[in-house]
From Swiss-Prot:
Keywords: ATP-binding, Cell inner membrane, Cell membrane, Cytoplasm, Membrane, Metal-binding, Nucleotide-binding, Protein transport, Translocase, Translocation, Transport, Zinc. One of its GO terms (biological process) is intracellular protein transmembrane transport. Zn(2+) binds at C880, C882, C891, H892. It comes from Legionella pneumophila subsp. pneumophila (strain Philadelphia 1 / ATCC 33152 / DSM 7513). Belongs to the SecA family. Coiled coil: none annotated. Residues 866-876 have a biased composition (Basic and acidic residues). This is Protein translocase subunit SecA.
């Protein structure tokens, strides 16, 4: 009651926003006579003037009125299109970082030019996001004359562009492209090996066309770049045959090729073992005569040897794994249960498969992934436009913090939306649809029949064929052809069947597309021929208006009211006449699940017979209530999933920030020194635990690990024998000094610049490998975390806790691996230092799979996330986003 009273007194939030913006419209209109008086050169010079004023301290908001007036005048001169006042309001809504709901035919493509131009003045770039490549190319070409007149550059991105072409496109002031392409380019940039390989600039301002489709419908499925792991089956098999020839060292001081550490579940080659395996590898022609296994070019070979040794020495059949159906299945050491689908990482699983003689699987690995909600939230400012957003306004506000502003139409809407007709059976419903289509055909009224699935559209097509009714079928497979058919769907007597999502972005013009007719004329067509085409189009246009405009028939209600409204919105553009009606049956999915009992009992009470429909506003209201419930359910699901996504996203931000910092470094000495100190401290703490008695120490094992893994000769037992009062901190100091001395010898051989390049390559390669394995671990954690609910634990909190633990472990392992490789690999020349980078680049050339499973036509709304970057770049003294409470530099920022 109170909210209704306040609305009556002050107007709704939407009305207040529109009233505020109407004042700005008056200011823009006041500039119009001045703009009309300017020459083309003077008008084009406005851009430079605005840039200078912006650089001198004027804000974009202060420039808005004059800039919008400039664009309107240029649009009229170049395209013959003048922005309506309501389009100016739409442009202001987008500039403020909100969503403009504008009906079909209200010129959203033209509206985008206003905020795009204004925000391009800052020089930081604008991305306009479309749902398919056809629309990106069409819209960029269509609006290009406006931007080029004003001295701005326009780029368009699409798949299969060369790297150089894409870099050039992104340098443009205004870039058009699809949501998929922007997302994949972001992921590829964060897999690049140097800053010069990146294509994207700052993610500054995005204008998302069909924002509901991208931020809600498509948000559920992530963008994934996956790559087939390199097929090393033959190498695993060859090395597997060599390992049984190695002999285990039983006691300290005995002969043997390798030792085992059961506590750490590790196996290490001894000095004799190194020589022996090098000899065996040389005989097998896997190593050149006289070459060391620890040469920089043999890092991958060393990795395979370590995996094979571990598989033979530490992993035993029917204890650690079983062989079932010709596959190696892991056994959980805690529960004794098998874990189908789980695989050991770092090549260990393949090494065990080679040992057991079963087929070696090279699975696809996820190299990088991101959801649209997490990608678009990184923009400094995000806005969107669509014909149908108001029904999802709560979700946009709650999850993206985006306001939806409903923009009034330029002309009054006169479309007639008729009440739903409900039948007992689907057969009755389809028969009624056929009759409606036939009646429209008699009066030559164009019809668009919307279906919820491709299957339904093809079934209806078969029924129309039986009745000899000529029609076109659209099911969103070929965008360019689709746009052409949709454009012609307004011709007299045209019948078009389309899935609900088909043809978004293209208007159905009554009488057909005049632009298409003119384009079909020969290039040298005379004015008379053009005039004849225009007259013919006008005749068709008038005929369709006389017949009642476009008729919309819905063959079933969708789970979302928004999709139903999209279908209805095809008719009644720019004040055109039109009508719409939905035909339903009690056998439809939505009716069967939610409304069938109530409606069926109502039909029985009214004595309805098969073939007879029920038409009542109560029925329509009951159906819409069912849709609201379902929308609420989907929103809750998306919100839940979003909470999980945010955990992974925080980790991604940390990794990508560190990665970019490392790529930008010319000298990595400080980073490596910090890592080395942490790794050595951690090693000492493992074998000589803090606050422990000397009896609990294992100095020999510590010496062995330092020797085997890091090639550091540290006689820790001797130090303790000589001085029983020695403290762990002193041992750490001595080990670190030896590690530095050992590494400094390598630096002296080839020089600091060469070593820095090698260090950077090793850090990036190791980071990428560990991040890839971490993504798989996070996925496995996510799949089973809901079971914690049965133990009265909050799955979300458990997921955060375990994800943090996994992330910390991953970074610890990463540092250990980097220092191990840098300590053990031999670098003799500058060429050796470039080997890793060359291997890495070769890996990147391998074809990567780009995956984004778009929702099928009958899939429902989806995941979502927030709007305008509320998190600035992570500062060294800011709290770490992982949630530990520590400063970033003391937590996950310690890598950089």
């Amino acid at each position: 009651m109170l909210s209704t009273l306040i609305k009556k007194m002050f107007g709704s939030r939407n009305e207040r926003t529109l009233r505020r913006m109407e004042k700005s419209v008056m200011a823009i209109n006041a500039f119009e006579p001045k703009m009309q008086a300017l020459s083309n050169e003077e008008l084009a010079g406005k851009t430079q003037e605005f840039k200078e004023r912006f650089n001198n301290g004027e804000s974009l908001d202060e420039l808005l009125a004059e800039a919008f007036a400039t664009v309107r005048e240029v649009s009229l001169r170049t395209l013959g299109l003048r922005h309506f006042d309501v389009q100016l309001i739409g442009g202001m809504v987008l500039h403020e970082g909100n969503i403009a709901e504008m009906r079909t035919g209200e010129g959203k493509t033209l509206v985008a030019t206003l905020p795009a131009y204004l925000n391009a003045i800052s020089g930081r770039g604008v991305h306009i996001v479309t749902v398919n490549d056809y629309l990106a190319k069409r819209d960029s070409q269509w609006m290009k004359p406006i931007y080029e007149f004003l001295g701005l550059t326009v780029g368009v991105i699409y798949p299969d562009m060369s790297h150089k072409e894409k870099q050039e496109a992104y340098k443009a002031d205004i870039v058009y492209g699809t949501n998929n392409e922007y997302g994949f380019d972001y992921l590829r940039d964060n897999m690049a090996f140097s800053l010069t390989d990146k294509v994207q600039r700052e993610l500054n301002f995005a204008i998302v066309d069909e924002v509901d489709s991208i931020l809600i419908d498509e948000a559920r499925t992530p963008l994934i770049i996956s790559g087939a792991a390199e097929d090393s089956s033959e190498l695993y098999i060859k090395i597997n045959s060599l390992i049984p020839q190695l002999k285990k060292q039983e006691e300290e001081g005995d002969e043997g090729d390798y030792t085992i550490d059961e506590k750490q579940k590790q196996a290490h080659l001894t000095d004799a073992g190194h020589l022996h395996i090098e000899e065996l590898l040389t005989k097998a022609k896997l190593l050149d005569p006289g070459e060391s296994l620890y040469h920089a070019s043999n890092i991958m070979l060393m990795h395979h040897v370590n995996a094979a040794l571990k598989a033979h020495a530490m992993f035993h059949r029917d204890i650690d794994y079983i062989v079932k159906d010709n596959q190696v299945v892991i056994v959980d050491e805690h529960t004794g249960r098998t874990m189908p689908g789980r695989r050991w990482s770092e090549g260990l699983h393949q090494a065990v498969e080679a040992k057991e003689g079963v087929p070696i699987q090279n699975e696809n690995q996820t190299l990088a992934s991101i959801t649209f909600q997490n990608f678009f939230r990184m923009y400094n400012k995000l806005s969107g436009m669509t014909g149908t957003a108001d029904t999802e306004a709560y979700e946009f506000q709650q999850i993206y913090n985006l306001e939806v502003v409903v923009i009034p139409t330029n002309r009054s809407m006169i479309r007639k939306d008729e009440a739903d007709l409900v039948y007992l059976t689907q057969a009755d419903k389809f028969q009624a649809i056929i009759e409606d289509v036939r009646e429209c055909g008699v009066r030559r009224q164009p019809v668009l029949v919307g279906t919820v699935s491709i299957e339904a559209s093809e079934f209806l097509s078969q029924l129309l064929k039986k009745e000899n009714i000529k029609h076109q079928v659209l099911n969103a497979k070929f965008h360019e052809k689709e746009a052409q058919i949709i454009a012609e769907a307004g011709r007299p007597g045209a019948v078009t069947i389309a899935t609900n999502m088909a043809g978004r972005g293209t208007d159905i013009v009554l009488g057909g597309s005049l632009a298409a007719d003119l384009a079909n004329l020969p290039a040298d067509a005379s004015e008379q021929e053009k005039e004849a085409v225009k007259k013919e189009w006008q005749k068709r246009h008038d005929e369709v208006i006389a017949a009642g405009g476009l008729r919309i028939i819905g063959s079933e209600r969708h789970e979302s009211r928004r999709i139903d409204n999209q279908l209805r919105g095809r008719a009644g553009r720019q004040g055109d006449p039109g009508s719409s009606r939905f035909y339903l049956s009690l056998e439809d999915n939505l009716m069967r699940i939610f409304a069938s009992e109530r409606v069926a009992s109502m039909m029985r009470r009214l004595g309805m017979q098969p073939g007879e429909p029920i038409e009542h506003s109560l029925v329509t209201r009951a159906i819409e209530n069912a849709q609201r419930k379902l929308e609420g359910h989907h929103f809750d699901v998306r919100k839940q999933l979003l909470d999980y996504d945010n955990v992974a996203n925080d980790q991604r931000q940390v990794i990508y920030t560190q990665r970019s910092s490392i790529m930008a470094m010319t000298d990595t000495q400080e980073v490596v020194e910090m890592m080395r100190e942490e790794v050595m401290d951690s090693l000492v703490d493992t074998y000589i635990p803090p606050q422990s008695l000397e009896d609990q120490w294992d100095p020999q094992a510590l010496s062995d690990v330092l020797s085997d893994e890091f090639k550091i000769k540290a006689p820790v037992p001797d130090w303790i024998d000589k001085d029983h009062s020695i403290q762990p901190e002193k041992i750490k100091e001595k080990i670190l000094a030896l590690a530095i001395e050992h590494y400094d010898e390598k630096v002296r051989k080839v020089g600091r610049p060469v070593i820095s390049q090698f260090e950077k390559s090793i850090i990036l390669q190791t980071l990428d490998n560990h991040w890839r394995e971490h993504l798989a671990a996070m996925d496995q954690l996510r799949q089973g975390i809901h079971l914690r609910g049965y133990a009265q634990k909050d799955p979300k909190q458990e997921y955060k806790k375990e994800a943090f633990s996994l992330f910390t472990m991953m970074l610890d392992n990463l540092k250990y691996e980097v220092i191990r490789i840098l300590s053990s690999v031999e670098i003799q020349t500058e060429e050796d230092a470039h080997v890793v980078e060359e291997q890495r680049r070769a890996d990147q050339i391998r074809k990567m799979n780009l995956m984004h499973e778009s929702l099928s036509e009958n899939d429902e709304a989806s995941e979502t996330q927030t709007f305008r970057r509320q998190e600035k770049k992570i500062g060294r003294n800011d709290p770490c986003p992982c949630g530990s409470g520590k400063k970033y530099k003391a937590c996950h920022g310690s890598l950089v």
